Each structure stands twice: as structure tokens, then as C-alpha cells.
């Protein structure tokens, strides 16, 4: 005796009883079909007007902005951070600031860049590039310089 028949006996289900119930259900079921409605000309016009809300992705894409800044004190670091928060890449020239304040600015901007998911790279002596997460930078300056001298 199989497991299936044990369950049927336990629940007192017979094949005949289950077939009878299925037949009764299938006879009572009547499918109602609606005919498609015809659209009026005004309905089509309204659909066309609402369909104009679709905008191509190329027109939405904004041009990337790069801001060049040359801070003279540590207090200007917040202005640089605000530019990064506004999703603009920033090149910072720290040549006109003391070495101690320049370190503080770089530390502050490193934290800002980390918080927004961006990146900071050294471009040259006291020159840094800070980018938000929407800007990808490929390559490094030292690689490019070495490749240029080898040619």
C-alpha cells in the first residue's frame, strides 16, 4: 500500500469523489468575455499628449563641471567640499598655503570624498584632483609621464 493511498484513506478521499467535485466545478464555470471597446479620436489624442512625457536619456545628461580652486587658508576647505557635494570635480592647487594647513585641507577633503563615495588623486606637487562618485578618472599622471619619456 503506497503512501498516496494512505493519505486518501486518512482524509477519506476517493478518486470517484474527487472526479465528481471537479466535474461539478467545471460545469458551473461560465467564462464571460468583454468585447474590446473602440477608442474615440479624443482618447487617442490624450494618449499621445501624455506619451510626450518621455524624455530621451541623452538630453537629460548634464555636462560635467570641473572647478579650479586655490585656497589660501584652511577655512576655504568647506567651500571645496560644497563643490564636491554638488557633484563637481575639483582641482586644488595648494602651492599658496602653508604646508601644515595644506595637510589639514587634504585630510578634510579626503574625509569628504570618502563620505560621498568619490576619489582623490595627486596630480603633481601640491595639486590634487577630487571627484564625486559620478566622475570616473582613468590612468595616473606618473604612468603617463613615464610613457611619454620612453617614447
UniProtKB/Swiss-Prot annotation:
It comes from the Bacteria. Residues 31-53 are annotated as: Disordered. GO terms for biological process: division septum assembly; FtsZ-dependent cytokinesis. Gene3D superfamilies: SepF-like protein. Cell division protein that is part of the divisome complex and is recruited early to the Z-ring. Probably stimulates Z-ring formation, perhaps through the cross-linking of FtsZ protofilaments. Its function overlaps with FtsA. Homodimer. Interacts with FtsZ. This is Cell division protein SepF. The lineage of its organism: Bacteria, Bacillati, Bacillota, Bacilli, Bacillales. The gene is sepF.
Amino acid at each position: 500500500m503506497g503512501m498516496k493511498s494512505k493519505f486518501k484513506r486518512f482524509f477519506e478521499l476517493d478518486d470517484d469523489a474527487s472526479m465528481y467535485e471537479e466535474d461539478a466545478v467545471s460545469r458551473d464555470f461560465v467564462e464571460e468575455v468583454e468585447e474590446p471597446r473602440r477608442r474615440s479620436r479624443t482618447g487617442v489624442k490624450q494618449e499621445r499628449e501624455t506619451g510626450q512625457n518621455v524624455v530621451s536619456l541623452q538630453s537629460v545628461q548634464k555636462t560635467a563641471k570641473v572647478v579650479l580652486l586655490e585656497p589660501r587658508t584652511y577655512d576655504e576647505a568647506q567651500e571645496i567640499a560644497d563643490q564636491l557635494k554638488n557633484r563637481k570635480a575639483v582641482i586644488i592647487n595648494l602651492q599658496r598655503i602653508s604646508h601644515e594647513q595644506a595637510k589639514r585641507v587634504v585630510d578634510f577633503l579626503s574625509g569628504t570624498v570618502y563620505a560621498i563615495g568619490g576619489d582623490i588623486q595627486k596630480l603633481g606637487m601640491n595639486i590634487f584632483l577630487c571627484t564625486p562618485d559620478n566622475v570616473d578618472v582613468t590612468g595616473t599622471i606618473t604612468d603617463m609621464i613615464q610613457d611619454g619619456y620612453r617614447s
